[in-house]
């Protein structure tokens, strides 16, 4: 399959090329002349939503293990070869995918392709390395538990998705991680790490013919595949509240609301609403809670979208004695938006901010490669012109339409981390009467 998408905005950008190569890998790439760098990423449909029972955390564990060595490179070789050309290589695991990515000068694209394919398709998985890395990942789990802001967001995710696959923790638990064996890892990779589940994205200074040949040749891993399809994710249907007691100075507050999948008209309207409510320094939450009342240093909002669902988060970190008041202020701003909507000035400013953020991101090959890869995973690639058109197509009416659907306090989820036991009754009363 070969499809070209025009991409006229941006200096030196050529058409976006989408292909399914003979080896089964989906390739999505855009040459960007005038840049010295090239960014390449490998996206694999292997994340916590695909894990069952004792597999919890295995996608993330594999992300760690592949950097410990391959059939042809040791861990030190991987670092030394990339350092020698001034490049970088890294990875992350998300709910719905694992991503390995590299950035090098255009002249070193062959090295990037070779190294990314090596770690994704031919890791050595030495048993001694596996046992050692279990300790590293368990420490990462403890580190998350010691970071109250991250813990609040993670807790909100588990609360808002209940029994759905998206509630599963990316890191797993210490018990599941400690139990992983080499056979477990190989079995999971045989199911998920196959060309049909892989997308390779690339943007920057490269030649399409050379890239195509390199990806088709090197990404040759074979496995049995997997017929498992995660159950449909569903948000909670009623209010839900969870408090995590931590002996720390601040209380970290997350309020969660229904959102939308990524490729929907509603999601673009939510992006505009987010900027006005808490997504910028000029937003209502920032101005009210930080600037006017001085009750928080960090206060913001953001939407999260997945393939079949999404949610909207409001966050603030504040002193224990002010926690109830901050929740009250957050809910007051929500009520104001539900009653009167956002102003024409907020609407215009939010749309312009979205366009500006996107266009500035085009100046990075890494940002472009990431956008292409995520778009391919979601099944829809936007050219620059199309995306700007989608943003400009958001109307005041479309934002008004989603406000009661998103800011539905009857389906609000709450996650609170800190010294909450003393204040839980007060905070819970405000939360439950909203």
List each model region and its residues:
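Charge-rich, well-structured scaffold segments of protease-associated domains
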Residues: 5, 20, 31, 75-227, ...
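N- or domain-start disorder-to-order transition segments that initiate the globular core
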Residues: 8-37
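A short local loop/turn or secondary-structure capping micro-motif enriched for an aromatic residue
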Residues: 36-38, 109, 263
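Active-/binding-site microenvironments in catalytic and ligand-binding cores
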Residues: 36-38, 92, 206, 234
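M16/MPP (pitrilysin/insulinase) zinc-metallopeptidase core fold and M16-derived inactive scaffolds
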Residues: 39-103, 279-295
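His/Glu-based metal-binding/catalytic segments typifying zinc-dependent metallopeptidases
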Residues: 41-43, 226-283, 390
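Short alpha-helix boundary/capping segments
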Residues: 50-57, 261-273, 277, 281, ...
